[in-house]
Amino acid sequence: PLQYRADAEVFIISKSRYGVDPYTVVKSAERVGENIAQVMKTDDFYQKVITQEGYILDLTDFEGEGVTERTKRKRWQKAIQSSVVFGTGVLHVSAYHEDPGQAKAFAGASVDTLVAKGWEYVGGDVTMKVVNKPVVTKFPARPNLLVNTVLGFIVGVLLMGVVALRRK
């Protein structure tokens, strides 16, 4: 199935101590961001996201009938991805879903969860702020590879047929 991507960004602010240079503060924020990127893949973070107020999330992919815990975790790890923009202390969060509105909702709930409850993962000396609200891609970000492969094969055969007929 085609999936849309919603991107949001969170700025990680390390409360600096006197005598610490800005480079060290940014490097500290990067390290915290790397840790958070790993924590976002966990079931604990998933539970916090789905209870985040202000968002209506479609959880059928994660909690539908016959979905095992292992399947739920794999799907969650594919649905939410995050990475640190190096040199900035900015955490880039992407959410994927078949419905663009749901992709935006999952990205928004994820970054709001980080701002509200991220201190549980990194301690109290770090604060986070949403610097870019979620924005959805206009076109699907994850195409259906099987359909694209079959269509590519068919178009290739048709084009080769046209080329072969013109050469005769």
Regions found by a protein language model. Give the residues of each.
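Hydrophobic and amphipathic membrane-targeting/association helices
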Residues: 1-168
